[in-house]
UniProtKB/Swiss-Prot annotation:
Keywords: Cytoplasm, Fatty acid biosynthesis, Fatty acid metabolism, Lipid biosynthesis, Lipid metabolism, Phosphopantetheine, Phosphoprotein. Residues 1-76 form the Carrier domain. It comes from Campylobacter concisus (strain 13826). The keyword Iron does not apply. It is found in: Cytoplasm. Pathway: Lipid metabolism; fatty acid biosynthesis. Belongs to the acyl carrier protein (ACP) family. Pfam families: PP-binding. The keyword Lipid biosynthesis applies. The lineage of its organism: Bacteria, Pseudomonadati, Campylobacterota, Epsilonproteobacteria, Campylobacterales. GO terms for molecular function: acyl binding; acyl carrier activity. 4'-phosphopantetheine is transferred from CoA to a specific serine of apo-ACP by AcpS. This modification is essential for activity because fatty acids are bound in thioester linkage to the sulfhydryl of the prosthetic group. One of its GO terms (biological process) is lipid A biosynthetic process. The gene is acpP. This is Acyl carrier protein.
Length: 77
């Protein structure tokens, strides 16, 4: 759950959303109101937080918070 909490913190900071609104099933664009620029900035913030590089081809697949958590866990962070 630690990865989720860290992801949630980044999402809350980047998108200025209520922490209660960020759930594993939340979709970044549809549910949390992000636009394409928000998504780019979110990916950059996640890369910095977790010290990883997320290629554009992978970033496009990160639709929900669960997708983000799974991806970061897969990288072993």
């Amino acid at each position: 759950m630690a990865v989720f909490e860290d992801v949630r913190d980044v999402v809350v900071e980047q998108l200025s959303v209520d922490p209660q609104a960020v759930k594993l099933e939340s979709k970044i664009i549809e549910d949390l109101g992000a636009d394409s620029l928000d998504v780019v900035e979110l990916v950059m913030a996640l890369e910095e937080k977790f010290e990883v590089e997320i290629p554009d081809s992978e970033a496009e697949k990160l639709v929900s918070i669960q997708d983000v958590v799974n991806y970061i866990e897969k990288l072993g962070k």
